[in-house]
Amino acid sequence: MTNALFQPIQLGNIELKNRIVMPPMTRSRATQPGNSANDMMAAYYAQRASAGLIIAEGTQISPMGQGYAWTPGIYSDEQIAGWKKVTDAVHEKEGVIFAQLWHVGRVTHPDNIGGEQPISSSALKAENVKVFIDNGTDEPGFVDVVEPREMTKEDIKAVVEQYRQAALNAIEAGFDGIELHAANGYLINQFIDSEANNRNDEYGGSIENRLRFLGEVVEAMVEAIGADRVGVRLAPFTSLNGTVDATPVETYTAAAALLNLYKIVYLHIAEVDWDDAPETPKTFKSAVRNAYQGVLIYAGKYDSERGEKAVAEGVTDMVGFGRPFVANPDLPARIQNGYPLAAHDPNTLFGGAEKGLIDYPEYAG
């Protein structure tokens, strides 16, 4: 029997060689000053180009969009040139790579955004959330986030425009497409989830209103670069970074239906993945399948067996394997051949240099 993970699949105008996705993972190794992607990052992604699709780590669309020290941006000429090194290296290995466009909203600290106050849907501080800043050492310094200010309508318009420009910048940098990060408690998620949004204008209250900002951003990016190059990531059931929705099934089924109207090329659902996390309800997965007609990606707690089963049963079209890709640059070959997986070193995930980024070997037998 052929493993369903190794069937090719059409993603817009691109044929992908398999259904294995390297999902976005922050590694905090951008060149300083300037937060630019670099040769080391190019080597890292090129090593993993056997994935059907690579979604690069979140890249902030503006200086205000940065939540953590040393993450890459995509708003300056220097940053576009840095990412071009990455996309060229991946394309040389016949890989396909999308950029993940990121604005953290309230999940930051003034030290990461030039001393400014963070912005969000509402002036609600994310409770019990820390981010890391550059404290002058090689180790990230963790600090509590601060209360944001509520975005004005002018702020909203400006950020929609920043997303549009970032999408254009990503194509200029050689990316095959972009993924809008609307998950994990960051800015767009702060509008979507009821408990993070207490606005009383057209961007708050009802599900339709809370999805309005998402729709405006997607519409701007689709107009700029085409729907066949735009994907979106959602996280319906996570409470990461302090965002919670009171009715996640209803909210996120409506989000899937909205995104279907824009004919985006894929919808990427991040499932809760801590050790004893509950399973995503099957009823929700089938509701999403019915609401959204494009390529579906699920990521979170998948091993090769579970991933293959999900694709074979039609629950999803592609599967993201996050942490396994850190220590296994040749993950598709290891899955296909039943080779053992290496474990990653958690101490080298964020910050630092080559160690823990590009020194994990391929399987040697």
Per-range role (PLM):
Residues 1-365:
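Flavin-dependent oxidoreductase catalytic cores
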